[in-house]
């Protein structure tokens, strides 16, 4: 998986040959637009978690989710869309069975 940043896409390549197997462009995922494609994680269930960074501009006004999870068919199954509380996301880490610490 190659996130292609400002090209607003990601590419799947064959690691042995370098051949491009698939390219997903900015408007290929129904219901969302890819912006600066940051890190992409493949989850245990095969879904992809895409960091959809919205740029260098402090006051960017784009209205797209910061994280997008898509299934094997390229359909959105979950997204995080909370710029007020979370802000820009360029990378993520998926932790299996993560539990929040007791913050009280």
Predicted regions and their residues:
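Histidine-/acidic-rich catalytic cores in large beta-rich domains
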Residues: 1-104
């Amino acid at each position: 998986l190659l996130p292609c940043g400002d090209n607003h896409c990601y590419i799947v390549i064959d690691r042995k040959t370098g051949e491009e197997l698939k390219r997903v462009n900015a408007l290929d995922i129904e219901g969302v637009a890819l912006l600066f494609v940051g890190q992409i994680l493949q989850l245990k269930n095969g879904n992809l978690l895409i960091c959809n960074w919205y740029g260098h501009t402090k006051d960017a006004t784009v209205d797209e989710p910061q994280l997008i999870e898509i299934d094997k068919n390229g359909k959105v199954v979950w997204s995080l869309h909370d710029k007020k509380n979370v802000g820009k996301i360029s990378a993520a880490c998926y932790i299996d069975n993560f539990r929040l610490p007791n913050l009280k």
